[in-house]
Swiss-Prot record:
Keyword Transit peptide: no
Gene source species: Aspergillus fumigatus (strain ATCC MYA-4609 / CBS 101355 / FGSC A1100 / Af293) (Neosartorya fumigata)
Gene that specifies this protein: bro1
A GO BP entry: protein transport to vacuole involved in ubiquitin-dependent protein catabolic process via the multivesicular body sorting pathway
Protein's recorded name: Vacuolar protein-sorting protein bro1
Organism ancestry: Eukaryota, Fungi, Dikarya, Ascomycota, Pezizomycotina
Residue spans of biased composition, Low complexity class: 775-792, 851-862, 884-895
Residue ranges the record marks as coiled coil: 748-775
Compositionally skewed regions (Basic and acidic residues) per UniProt: 746-762
Amino acid sequence: MVQSPMLSCPLKQTNEIDWIRPLKDYIRQSYGEDPERYNQECATLNRLRQDMRGAGKDSATGRDLLYRYYGQLELLDLRFPVDENHIKISFTWYDAFTHKPTSQYSLAYEKASIIFNISAVLSCHAANQNRAEESGLKTAYHSFQASAGMFTYINENFLHAPSTDLNRETVKTLINITLAQAQEVFLEKQVTDQKKAGFLAKLASQAAYLYSQAAEGIQEYAKGVFDKSWTIVVQAKAAHMASVASYYQALADSESNSHGVAIARLQLADKNSTAAMGWANLVDTIKYHQANVQVKLATFVKDNDFIYHQPVPNEAGLSAVAKLPAAKAIPVSELYQGQDIQRIIGPDIFQKLVPMSVTETASLYDEEKAKLIRAETEKVETADSEMAASLDYLKLPGSLNILKGGMDQEMTVDDEFRQWCQELAGHQSFAKAFDTLQDRKGEILSQLDRCSKQLDLEESVCEKMRSKYGADWSQQPSARLNSTLRSDIRTYRDTINEASASDSQLLATFRQYETDFDEMRSAGETNEADVLFQRAMIKAGSKHGKGRNGVGSPYASTQEGSLLDDVYDEGSLSVAEQIARVESILKKLNLVKRERSQVLKDLKEKVHNDDISNVLILNKKSIAGQESQLFETELEKFRPHQNRLLQANHKQAALMKELTKVYGDLLQDKRVRSEQSKYEAITRQRNTVMARYKKIYDAFNGLLSGIAQAQTFYTEMVETVESLKKNVETFINNRRSEGAQLLGQIEREKAGTATDQEDREREKLRQLMERLSTEPKPTSTPLPSTAPSKAKSPPPPVKAPGYPGPGIASPQMSPHFAPGVAGQQHGIPLSHSPAPYGQYVAPPSGVSYMQGQPFQQGAAAPLSEGYNPMAYPAPTSISPPPSQQYYSSTPAPYSGYSNPAPPNAPSQFMPQGYVPPPPPPRPQQPSYPPSTGPYPSGPGGYAQSRPYGTSQHHKTPSQSQSSSSTDPWAGLNAWK
């Protein structure tokens, strides 16, 4: 068949645009990133559009340039909304037929124009192929179909065409033309291959139909769009293809003895060829074809006139030639297969800017993959657990080893038992540890007893002094202050008693297992654990104990032959053969398990590497709302692995069924059952021995842990009781110092009272002498220096415990102590106000008391420390009377002075002429405590005190000795 020329669609032209600036502005505004980071990406897209404008019309390179730019536009559309409201870029394209410019801001218009040019390039590429060659013919056939597919994509996706060339009717006409030309190319190939006339007639009929459809479209809907030559060519080709169809159908009719019909068809073919002569370029082709038609027509007429004599129907009576479509539009998705898409389009230019929609869809697909993996993994784990449970129930393969070696297995020492003996080796007896614990406990109890005795002695002395001095002894009762200390002592005693109970339990455990400990320790040290194990087995009733040296115990039974040596009836399998069958099935099961694990591993790896991001990006709009169908399609690629896992599970079930039957038959053997009973008896004895020594070993570890805890407990208790002891000593020292000061004040008061009495007696004697004197009374008689008047002068100053106001020194007066003190009602600051010892806070069990700070004169006691009366400035006041809970100052007068009691007038009680005796000598007044240094002012607003023991209060060494000899508290010095 002579090749006819083909039509090709012209390309649309466009003006240059700038992608860079609008994209950078959008990246800055919408993505919040630095647009300078995307300079290269923006420049790449801009360069792709420039390259697309110069794409060749009839080359595959030009087609790929256009498709690369189009693919990047599809990817760009996922991230950047290019329209009039967002990224505003004016795209100007010229109509391919009328050459009129059209401008729009829509990216869809840009993509439609690119696809139109791809179709045009494909049609040009197909029309320029040399169809005389096999490769050229195939390329032309494929390119015409691909061009039709691109036009179809435009017709289906771009409904509102802004230009004439993109109009639906124009595009539909182009589709018919490209498909008709693809059909014609296929017909040429079949004519060359000399296919049957009927088949060729159908192909030509389809081509004629497509050309006629295109001709109608040009005449009805696209007038003024296509060039006039397109109309002539399409009409001429429609008539020519109809002539070819009639010609080959006539040949087919002649072969089927329809000679009259064949003649009529040849006449029709000749008529169509004459009509097709309208286009000059087809004249030669049509003339050649018409000559063939006329030759055949003359031959058929002659044969029919002389031979067949069949009537020749008219043209209207001929049936239409059947049509056979051989060309179809290739969709865009099939234009490039496999890796060609990635190779032509290249990587996503803006892949660093991931759209949220694609990410969400990909995450949904990942979840579907995860569900698949979880389901298959669960099935594999279930199958493995079922196999393990079944084998464990059958006691396989362990029981096979027993059967293969005979039931009389060597009862060697257990490795765990040997390890226990080795751990006990080298450990000393616990007796010494228990002795140490008892010693520590005794030491703690002794300390607690001493503390109690010291508190009892202090309390006894305090109450004796109160009994002696009555209301003058106003020191706080000890029972109120030492209650916390006594409570701590009781708590510690209770804690020690509880610990003693625990010690007794530990000791009982030690006594119970002492012999066993010694045996295991000796066995571990001499490496004779197997000997000890043998004795235990013999004691448990075993007759099969056997040591490492291979010497059987004296109670071992006579050795019998192995079960593998026994052969039964010829018609039955021996024990060895049955064991071999069981082992064979076990090997198959293990092989199935390994294969299943490997298939699951391969499936996980394949799922992990599966990525459909490109599919999601390229088909973003087409799969909208149909993600589940896409996921199902993509997951089908894992179906082979799932089938292999399913087959493995079925195979395992069949093997387990066979194993159960074979192994059950083996166990029903009489000899096997008899020997198995013996072995089970030995196993029970062995378990009994191991359970006994496990209990001993646990008791040993329990003793180690218990003694370690007891040692830690007693160590902490020693520290705690030592702290308690220091607190008790501090408390007693403070009480002693306070009592000593109180005793000194009482003695000084008594001495002051005696001095006042002496002065009053002297004054009365002087007045009596004046009355008895006959000399005239002088106006002013000074008293002798040896008898100073006490009416106007105060007694010798004594440092009184008065409460001076702020910044005012207290005058040195002898205090007057009232039996009832009510200073609590006035809130007067205290010169010394020790709180009851109840302020001591007992620490929790195991926690040491705060270390008592030794008293140091000249340093104020911090408020955070415990009770310490010695840390406050001297002189300190005495404790309040028993009726008071806390210390308080004396009542009014508030000036700090105490009014001495008025002396009694002896003249009212003595007879006339009574001469009083001379006054007794003034007693030496002791001072407590001895002055050893200055006393600082303490916290709480105490006034600064002068150093105690200065001026008239300074004592000589002899006086100090005399004072200490009469001090009832001096005996408490030995407490410390």
